[in-house]
Amino acid sequence: MRTIAFCILSASLLIASVAHGATLQVSSNLQAAIDAASPGDTLLVAMGVYDKITIQKSLNLVGNGAVIRAGNRDACVNIDADNVRISGFLVRDGFYGIKLNYVSGCIVANNTVIHCAQPGIALLFSDGNTITGNNASFNGIVGEGWYGIYLSNCNDNNITNNVAFGNGAYGINLFPSCSNNTIRGNVLQGNMYGLYMFTDCTKNLIEKNDMSRNTNSGLDLRINCTENLIINNTMENNVVAGLTLMEESGENTISGNVIRSNGRYGLQIQSRSDGNTIIHNNISDSQTGIFLESSNNKIYGNRIADNVIQADDRGINRWNAQYPKGGNLWSDYHGQDEMQGPGQEAPGKDGFGDEPYLISKTVKDQYPILGGQVKQIVILTKEMTPSEARVGDAVAIKAKLQSRHNLLQVSARAYQDGLEAQGYCRLVLSGDLYQGAFSTALLEPGRYDIVLSAKDARGYELQETLGEVKVTSRRGFASS
């Protein structure tokens, strides 16, 4: 029996209007129920395991945990009609999970799609759809699709608040020719790439996604992916890079992102990917913060901090805006601010260093922003006794160090008048102190600075004077 009713869906499904039609209870043969339903009907599907389905009319399917499974050469859910809504299903083990073909106005919400050979959720030649709140994980691991969520030749879709974890290659993949899509608020972790855009993907909004802990890059754009807006995303702890632009992927805007603790590069831009604007990002704690083999990129207003190599520019790029907008904040810039003006020639402070920050011999940031100095290795406490020793005596050294990365080597050496003297002492961690005994046996009488050297696993180094030791002659010997 069919009961005419209003079906009000929750706001989490992003359905703005009330659906008019019949509400049907389904407990067996879901495909038969779909075939018998009329456009606009709502199907409430009971718990259970159902075979693959094809939807060719405007329907609203509500799963409440029902399972849809298919063989590994079939799609679990084929959507071939506009304005279909499907929510609350566990979809698994198909060739595709949920596949949208040449449709618009569809909403796919709050489903879990796992263990499919091809994409978990796929949109093919489909515009104006919403994919929200889904978990598309562990797809394409042994198959040939590799994707959590896949868009091909798709425009004006909203892909929001989904999780794509542990897929064969891509959390979300756009290929080819996908434009004006919104990719917002997704968690794309544990894949090879978090978000991968390939071939003529333009004018997309990439916003507030977490693209971290992937085995290659968090976000990767290749082959003429241009005019995209990449804002307020997090790209941390990816093995290769936080963000990569390659093969003529230019004219993109990259703003307000946290790009931190990535293995090789925070941001790499290569192979004629020209004319990008990189502003107001936090690019830190990577082997190389920014790597450029392209030109005409504008880089300013960024915090570039604590990278082993802050920037490597092999093109012709601009590292500051015109005065008074300025350049970037560099954690290893130690200049002063006593002058102001475009040429930094007028007395007065303006927040910019008076001398440029040198990226290389030929590349500079003309207006480095002050306030970014951060030490990766810090001496918290130090003790050196005695302060006066005879030749041959040992000087006991204790130091407590703080490091953001594992310390590989800590040692002490003697310097006199700025020149290294003979003698070396390795400091070994005991409890929370690095300790060692520096022998003065090879030193001539005189005054020496004892300098601590430390190096961590990321290649950061520290050299800091612990104090001065006066070395005197041994008893019975006079200094020459």
Task: Describe these PLM feature segments.
Residues 22-51:
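Acidic Gly/Asp/Thr-rich repetitive segments characteristic of extracellular carbohydrate-active
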